[in-house]
Amino acid sequence: MKRKAFIVLIFLLSFAIRFSLEEYQKIILKGVNVEREKNNLKPLKIDNRLNKIAIVKAKDMTREKKMSHTSKKFGVTFNLIKKEGIFYTKAAENIASGHKTPEFVTERWLKSKGHRKNILERDYRFIGIGKATDNDGKIYWVQIFTN
């Protein structure tokens, strides 16, 4: 009986984790696209392969315990994009850490000149969004953009 209850608990937890990932991605995507619309730009579309890469990148930063565009393990994020077989001629990455909510990290990205430039780049059509939390509770956030 305990084994069956444990299996049900694991199933429910995996569903909850999956739901929360999708929810934060939707919130960030909405914030980004509202700002793009204000600037007469087409909305970005979620690319699940870019989401996967963004999550890998966020998890990598938790392992390294630092926010960086370059990883000891993967090099630059664009290596992961190429490895996944995604063709692009233009790409960018926004990263952040420490912000507790998707709304707040989006607000901070939009207030930063460089991050805002990536979000409002006319040529970008696709976005991947990821996050990971380290053992100390610090959250690392990633956005990846491609045309």
Predicted region positions:
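Sec-dependent N-terminal signal peptides
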Residues: 4-13
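Bacterial Sec-dependent signal peptides at the C-terminal "C-region" and cleavage site
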Residues: 12-24
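A short alpha-helix/helix-coil micro-patch that ends at or immediately precedes a cysteine
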Residues: 21-63
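Surface-exposed patches in mature extracellular/periplasmic domains of secreted proteins
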Residues: 38-52, 65-73, 92, 116-122, ...
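Short, surface-exposed glycine/acidic/tryptophan-bearing loops
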Residues: 52-100, 119
